[in-house]
Each structure stands twice: as C-alpha cells, then as structure tokens.
Amino acid sequence: METWALILAAGQGSRLLSTIGIAKQFFVWKGIPLYWQSVLQFMHCARIRGVVLVFPSEVKDNEEKVVDRLAAQYDLRLPYIVISGGKLRQDSVKNALNTLPKNCSHVLIHDAARPFISPKLINNVIEVLEAGAVGVVPGISVTDTIKQVIQGEVIVTRPREQLIAVQTPQGFHLKTIVEGHNRATLEKWTVTDDASLLELCGHTVQVINGEIENRKISFPQDLLYMVEQPKTTVPIVGYGYDVHKYVTEDQINQPIRSMRLGGISIPNAPNVVAHSDGDVLLHALMDALLGCIGGGDIGLHFPDSDKRYDGINSAILLDHVLTKVLESSIKIVHMDATIVAQLPKISQYREAIRSNLSRLLDLDLANVNIKATTEEGLGFTGECKGIKAIVIVTAIRIS
C-alpha cells in the first residue's frame, strides 16, 4: 500500500482575507504558514510516502520557493510536488490526483485550513484503508440542532443523532476517487467534499471518530484557538534496550532479515534473526517511549506470536507507539542512543540515521544523538554474534 497526502491550499480564504489581509492558509503561526503545519504532521507518519501541495495559480511559483526553503529547513525526507489549483475545490483535487506517481494506491486529502491535525488521526484513517475500505472520513458529533431552511423558513429539523460534522483528512482508494472525479466532470456535479463523489457513485464511505481539536480556521475569531494557554510540565525519562542475533548456519530455518538501523538499510552488514524487520535501534527506541508512558514493552504490544507483525517495517510500529505517547500528553524533547556491535561499522550511516529519527520523532536534529561502540572483542557482540542498542528518551508530560 503506497499512500500520498494532498494538502489543499488553493482556496481564496475570503473571510479572513477581508479582515487580516491574507488568505488563511498563508497565515503565519509559530513562524511558518498554516499549510506547513499540516505538512509537518504528515511528515511524521511512516505510512505517508509523499505530499502534493496545491496553491492558487497566481502564487504557485512563489510558494514553491517557500516550500523548497521549508523542506530544507525541516529536513522533509519525503518526495513533494507543488502544483496550481483550479477554479473549484474539486478542480484542485483533480489536478493533484493527476500528478500522483504510478505506484500510489491510496490518497489522503486534507484542507490546509485544518492545522491541528494529529498523527493519530492520520494513522486511524490509513488503518481503515488498509482494512479494505475505499473511502473513509473522520467526523465529530453535532451538538447544535440542525434545521434545513429555504428563504428564511424552516423546512425540516434533522435528528442530530444521525448527523456528524465531517473533517479532513479524507482517505480513498486512489482508482476509486479518480473515477469519482472523472464522473463529476461528465455529470457536472459540484460537491464540497470528496467523499460526496463516492456516495454519488454508489460506494460506501466509512466514518471514524474525528477530533474536536482538528478545527477549521475560517473566521477571524477562530484565530483565538491558536493562542496557547500556560501549561505545567513534568520531566520524564524512558530507557530502552534491545538485542538481535546474527544469522549462523544453525539458524537458517529462523526468520532472517537484512539489517536496518533507525529505519535506514545497512548494506553488506550481517543479517539478523527477527520476527519483524529486526531494526534493533527502533525497537530500543519504542521501549524507551513506552517507558515514558508506563506502557510496558514492545513484546506486549507487538508479540512475535502474531503473524501480522511478520517482517513488518518497524517504523510502522513506531507510529503506533508515538500515537500512544501523544494520547498520554507526552512531548518528546531528546533522544540519545548507543549502538553496540563489532560489525557493522556505523560511522558512514550515522547522519542518515539521525536525520530519519529526527523526522520520525519531530525533533530538531540537535536533539537526536547516535553513538556507536564495540565491546573490545568481549561478549556476544565482540564475537560478532549479534548487535544491541540502548536508547534514553527525555520527555515532558504536559498538563
């Protein structure tokens, strides 16, 4: 499954434009435009393989330069495409769908005016797609009574228990949503969200719980939600340790994996025995993160007796752990790791590993440290029988 994200920033934003003189998606918050807040959240999800950003045609060239600068500044280790939007929202989406690579199978479509999207919600949408859904939308319960009105007169009052307020990102099987947009062009349909096209084509759209915090910035008063309130913090430290054996002749019937460290492939290194992908560094990191929240260890969450995790990319498991960290109101501030092995030599891969972990953890590169050492020929690592990793994570609990 190859999933890309489309971030729509091509709207006129007329409500805010008339008040503060700038379209909402370009409003600068915490030093960056609103649309980049969404890019950062998608960037930290291992399942996302690339991003398409859609801007008004008159500012596309300028914003492409801004995106290039931000991508370098924030070490965006994802392919990205910058394109011009169309007259209507659905025209912008169709333009973006046509730019996706051939190997893309699924897409998440997100409004840039929702900067408070969480990695947890992104992962929840993707998980439903992985289970076979062709369309999925997040939604929250409606608390107000909703009435249908024509020319100032109430026509009908809708039972609010049957209603939800739909959010983005909305997730789709790519071929299905492309067919929906193509049919919309033929039938001259105009819709306000992409899920409506699947509904009109007779497809089932699944609904998952959205997030109240995932609000849309539309009116000037919405900017008040962007003012952060004072919070108290408590420092936390998590410790993680993991070991993997190297493959020997008597282990040829066990699961054998090519070596990966911190999500980076290490060529010409010894193969490891492992149920998942055998990334000893990510496994130690996950244990350290779980230690921060009192969450047990990775064996509890991803047992090696479960075939679902056979050969799985450990970055996907890390996504699940990071979601639990976010749910616990924990903010990671630093990680320090030591890799212990006689072989392979880590020095030439150190910066690639740091950069990838910086992206996955949403940390500045300066707050990610990777060390490597040997045990001077002693023990199982010194005898080239295996590798181990030790990780210390520093975090704060916010309340």
UniProtKB/Swiss-Prot annotation:
Positions bound to 4-CDP-2-C-methyl-D-erythritol 2-phosphate: 242-244, 275-276, 297-299, 302-306, 373-376, 380
Pathway the protein acts in: Isoprenoid biosynthesis; isopentenyl diphosphate biosynthesis via DXP pathway; isopentenyl diphosphate from 1-deoxy-D-xylulose 5-phosphate: step 2/6; Isoprenoid biosynthesis; isopentenyl diphosphate biosynthesis via DXP pathway; isopentenyl diphosphate from 1-deoxy-D-xylulose 5-phosphate: step 4/6
GO MF terms held by the record: 2-C-methyl-D-erythritol 2,4-cyclodiphosphate synthase activity; 2-C-methyl-D-erythritol 4-phosphate cytidylyltransferase activity; metal ion binding
Region 2-C-methyl-D-erythritol 4-phosphate cytidylyltransferase: start-end pairs: 1-235
Site positions for Positions MEP for the nucleophilic attack: R160, K216
InterPro entries: IspD (IPR001228), IspD/F (IPR026596), IspD/TarI (IPR034683), ISPD_synthase_CS (IPR018294), MECDP_synthase (IPR003526), MECDP_synthase_CS (IPR020555), MECDP_synthase_sf (IPR036571), Nucleotide-diphossugar_trans (IPR029044)
Ligand binding (a divalent metal cation): D242, H244, H283
Record keywords: Isoprene biosynthesis, Lyase, Metal-binding, Multifunctional enzyme, Nucleotidyltransferase, Transferase
Site-annotated residues for Transition state stabilizer: R15, K24, H275, T374
Catalytic activity from the UniProt record: 2-C-methyl-D-erythritol 4-phosphate + CTP + H(+) = 4-CDP-2-C-methyl-D-erythritol + diphosphate; 4-CDP-2-C-methyl-D-erythritol 2-phosphate = 2-C-methyl-D-erythritol 2,4-cyclic diphosphate + CMP
Region named 2-C-methyl-D-erythritol 2,4-cyclodiphosphate synthase: 236-399
UniProt superkingdom: Bacteria
EC number in record: 2.7.7.60, 4.6.1.12
Pfam families xrefs: IspD (PF01128), YgbB (PF02542)
Function per UniProt: Bifunctional enzyme that catalyzes the formation of 4-diphosphocytidyl-2-C-methyl-D-erythritol from CTP and 2-C-methyl-D-erythritol 4-phosphate (MEP) (IspD), and catalyzes the conversion of 4-diphosphocytidyl-2-C-methyl-D-erythritol 2-phosphate (CDP-ME2P) to 2-C-methyl-D-erythritol 2,4-cyclodiphosphate (ME-CPP) with a corresponding release of cytidine 5-monophosphate (CMP) (IspF).
Protein name: Bifunctional enzyme IspD/IspF
Record gene name: ispDF
